[in-house]
Amino acid sequence: MDFNNKIVIIDKPKNISSAFCLNLFKKRFNIKKAGHNGTLDPLASGVLVVATNKRTKELSQLNQDDKQYLVKLKFNTHTDSYDRLGKVIRTTNYVPEIKQLNDYLTSLDNHSFYQLPPNFSALKVNGVRAYQLARKAVDFELEKRPTTIYKAKLISYYDDYAEILLDVKKGFYVRSFVVDLASQFNTTAMMVDLVRTRSGQYSLKDVIDYQFNK
């Protein structure tokens, strides 16, 4: 397979970083230059749009693409990283009723707002990745960023778990959404699974047939 000078859609596996996945791709297919259009959490899987060699000049435009995510969350647990990999900070004992949750999600259609990114993120603070500072318990503050939820739909709801399909603007932080959602009901939540199902015009049906194992 020749992936030089092309736009390639990768299904990033769970438990590796987007950068590590990109390096595996470059090494496996002998690609000299490549970039992707948006970091996925190590916990997440799904669509990673990669541009190679001459097509990398298109990344600035690809970075503007809207995204779709399927997130699975668990109520009643809050961690420092906002996901199941983090240290548990607080637990609660309340789960909203399905009608409450559905009504709130419906109210978010075409909702633009300022979102606070998680401290455990790839954003840079004075040249250092925020997650590196967070791991060292260094105090710092991130600024809220403008974003938009186009649609939020409840897919399933059982016990303390909910699955929600999100159509959002680029730069949206799903982990922050999970925490903010729970706070609307005076409870807690953490992200337990995340799949990016679409990025711009590309979806999971467009991914190449290759397993990126370590």
UniProtKB/Swiss-Prot annotation:
Its EC number is 5.4.99.25. It catalyses: uridine(55) in tRNA = pseudouridine(55) in tRNA. The active site is at D41 (nucleophile). It is an enzyme of class 5 (isomerase). Keywords: Isomerase, tRNA processing. GO terms for biological process: mRNA pseudouridine synthesis; tRNA modification. Belongs to the pseudouridine synthase TruB family. Type 1 subfamily. This is tRNA pseudouridine synthase B. The lineage of its organism: Bacteria, Bacillati, Mycoplasmatota, Mycoplasmoidales, Mycoplasmoidaceae. The gene is truB.
